[in-house]
Amino acid sequence: MFRLLTLALAAVVAVAAPAQAKAPFKSDRIIVTTVGQGPDVVLIPGLSSSPKVWEQTVKDHPGYRFHLVQLNGFAGAPVGGATTGDVAAPAAEEIARYISEQHLKKPAVIGHSMGGTMAMMVAARHPDEVSKVMVVDMLPFMGAMFGPPGSTSESLKPTAERIRKSMVEANDAQRAAALNATIAGMIRTVDMRPLALADAQASDQDVSARAFAELILTDLRPELKSISAPLTVLFVRGNNAPVTDAQMEGFYKASFVSLPAATLKRIPDSDHFIMFDQPKVFADEVSAFLKN
């Protein structure tokens, strides 16, 4: 009888004891917060942005556990380890480490702009860690937009350095004017511009400049064939693009030619921040992506 009581008590204690908590994730490159319950989805914002760009996305899609990534040095976050060198690539490695160490079960990954670059990095370099990827308005080689046909990372180094230097050396007035013009060209929904502008203004000038130069020189086209997860790419032509819709579609098809299974879809009547300019369309695309 005593043995039975002892075993019963041990069983009760085992059930009542809390599971061992996961060690908190520590990084000097990214800060991650989680919202909701359900299948895991990693959301990565773009250059000089914050997870605030995903607020409506989270609201529109209950039933998922969203992992909101904030890069150090952007939108008021401490610079941390992003003091020198590349910004996107090291942060992408930290996202992959986060997925592994926090035991996420092959999450979906959605990245906007530079976040899209990082999503492709994770998918190509850690293909077993993700289930599917959505890239929001980003090419595998952004530098192609900054030079003549046939430009390479090597040939664009002077351009990238010139842009980096001009961003770092801009005074307050010049920086404010540049940010206002840039945001106006990226978001046609006027009411949504202040959010993105505030994030950009709060970003570290040097970190943003190095990240932009890094994006110009990052050519992921040779790595696309390493992506085994389904890839969806949403893109826009944009008001200021000196090309037709058909030309932009052709440009994206050519850029992703080594990944023929990728789903490429142009979103009309939108600039770079599709989630702001076409919120209903964007919500529908994300819903289809997550459910597929």
Model-derived features: positions:
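Alpha/beta-hydrolase fold catalytic core
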Residues: 2-42, 61-65, 105, 260-263, ...
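Conserved HGGG/HGGXW glycine-rich cap/lid loop of the alpha/beta-hydrolase fold
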Residues: 30-80
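Active-site loop/oxyanion-hole signature of alpha/beta-hydrolase fold enzymes
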Residues: 35, 67-110, 114
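Conserved loop-alpha-helix segment in the C-terminal half of the alpha/beta-hydrolase fold
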Residues: 60, 230-231, 235-270
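Conserved hydrolase catalytic core segment
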Residues: 105-147
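Flexible "cap/lid" loop of the alpha/beta hydrolase fold
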Residues: 133-169
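Conserved alpha/beta-hydrolase catalytic His-Asp/Glu region
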Residues: 145, 150-151, 166-225
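Catalytic histidine-centered segment of alpha/beta-hydrolase-like enzymes
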Residues: 270-279, 283
